[in-house]
């Protein structure tokens, strides 16, 4: 890349984007292909939790919606890196896509923190704090999280994010070295958006493990399963978010010149790409490991098999010679529709409650 002109001055800071332009398309395509269908299913399972009056579903749905917003911005970022970091859309679209890219991190962290606290209260204090474990309380907390991040987004809308370099490339959300106005918002992001929530999350999961170890009614295999789930959740959370925030803090503290910006560019953008995998990890950890979700998937699979079976039967009957006898005495869709509806109905018959009670797998995630 060439020299980048910032809001305040022209800075000669040519940075080689080759590694970033090679890795980013691979990551973005992977997250698009895997993350979009996974999060669509996750949204459906979260809806089932809400339908069962389980407050966990509110947090899961909001977490999934945030991930889907981010995934919807990936085609624009994919086009951007494939055009050698040249933003071909308007300034406002750059700001919106940048906000979706960065604010998704803190919206996700916020809801992951809420899920961990909710599961801690369910496991360690199942007969207390009911006022905090209701749909109304979950909706109120969700509104606060979205409002906090929307207010933060306004801060970026007041600054120019599309900058033209000496090669007439319009770079988006890239300032090298980091600007003064970015330092304060980065400190806020690190302390309030990451450090405080991760402390709450770690404390909650530690409390869950303590409560599970003290439980005499839980089998050892079940305890081991819970411990593995908690450990994997924490490890994936730290792997996705810790490197980026450490480097964000390093940039904010010490990036004063172009040489430092060039030296940290590749590792910083690699850490930013790691945050993208959170969109894939969320539905896996918080939905697809759930026992209730396994049952829902089995019902969904059964419904799909019912559709395919009826479709194959219909095609086979259509292949009969003219005048051939038919077992049902009916033909076409009229003979198949009742059978299909019956199979779909039986496949989706659910227990009276899909909620998660006590230390179940999804309850701990």
From Swiss-Prot:
Task: Please explain the role this protein plays, according to its UniProt record.
Answer: Proton-sensing G-protein coupled receptor activated by extracellular pH, which is required to monitor pH changes and generate adaptive reactions. The receptor is almost silent at pH 7.8 but fully activated at pH 6.8. Ligand binding causes a conformation change that triggers signaling via guanine nucleotide-binding proteins (G proteins) and modulates the activity of downstream effectors, such as phospholipase C. GPR68 is mainly coupled to G(q) G proteins and mediates production of diacylglycerol (DAG) and inositol 1,4,5-trisphosphate (IP3).
Query: Which keywords annotate this record?
Result: Cell membrane, Disulfide bond, G-protein coupled receptor, Glycoprotein, Membrane, Receptor, Transducer, Transmembrane, Transmembrane helix, Tumor suppressor
Q: What is this protein called?
A: G-protein coupled receptor 68
Q: Which GO CC annotations does the UniProt entry carry?
A: plasma membrane
List the gene name. Answer: Gpr68
A Pfam family that this protein carries is 7tm_1
In terms of InterPro entries, this protein maps to: GPCR_Rhodpsn (IPR000276), GPCR_Rhodpsn_7TM (IPR017452), OGR1_rcpt (IPR005389)
Q: Which residues are glycosylated?
A: 3, 8
């Amino acid at each position: 890349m060439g020299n980048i002109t910032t809001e305040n001055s022209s800075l000669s800071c040519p940075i080689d984007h080759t590694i970033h332009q090679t890795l980013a398309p691979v990551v973005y395509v992977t997250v698009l292909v895997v993350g979009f269908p996974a999060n669509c299913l996750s949204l459906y399972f979260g809806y089932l939790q809400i339908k069962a009056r389980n407050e966990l579903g509110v947090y899961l749905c909001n977490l999934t919606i945030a991930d889907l917003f981010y995934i919807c911005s990936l085609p624009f970022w994919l086009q951007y890196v494939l055009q050698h970091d040249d933003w071909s859309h308007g300034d406002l679209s750059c700001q919106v896509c940048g906000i979706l890219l960065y604010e998704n991190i803190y919206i996700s962290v916020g809801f992951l923190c809420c899920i961990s606290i909710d599961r801690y209260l369910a496991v360690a204090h199942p007969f207390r704090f009911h006022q905090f474990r209701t749909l109304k309380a979950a909706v109120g907390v969700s509104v606060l999280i979205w409002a906090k991040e929307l207010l933060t987004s306004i801060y970026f809308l007041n600054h120019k994010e599309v900058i033209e370099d000496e090669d007439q490339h319009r770079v988006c959300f890239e300032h090298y070295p980091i600007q003064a106005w970015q330092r304060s918002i980065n400190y806020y992001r690190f302390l309030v958006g990451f450090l405080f929530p991760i402390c709450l999350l770690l404390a909650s999961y530690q409390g869950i493990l303590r409560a599970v170890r003290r439980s005499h009614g839980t089998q050892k295999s079940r305890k081991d399963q819970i411990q593995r789930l908690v450990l994997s959740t924490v490890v994936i959370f730290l792997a996705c978010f810790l490197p980026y925030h450490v480097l964000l803090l390093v940039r904010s503290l010490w990036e004063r010149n172009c040489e430092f910006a060039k030296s940290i560019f590749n590792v910083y953008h690699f850490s930013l790409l790691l945050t993208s995998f959170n969109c894939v990890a969320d539905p896996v950890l918080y939905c697809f490991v759930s026992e209730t979700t396994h049952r829902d998937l089995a019902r969904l699979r059964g419904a799909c098999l019912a559709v395919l079976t009826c479709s194959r039967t219909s095609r086979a009957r259509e292949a009969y010679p003219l005048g051939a006898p038919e077992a049902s005495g009916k033909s076409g869709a009229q003979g198949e529709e009742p059978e299909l509806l019956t199979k779909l109905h039986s496949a989706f018959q659910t227990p009276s409650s899909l909620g998660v009670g006590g230390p179940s797998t999804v309850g701990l995630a």
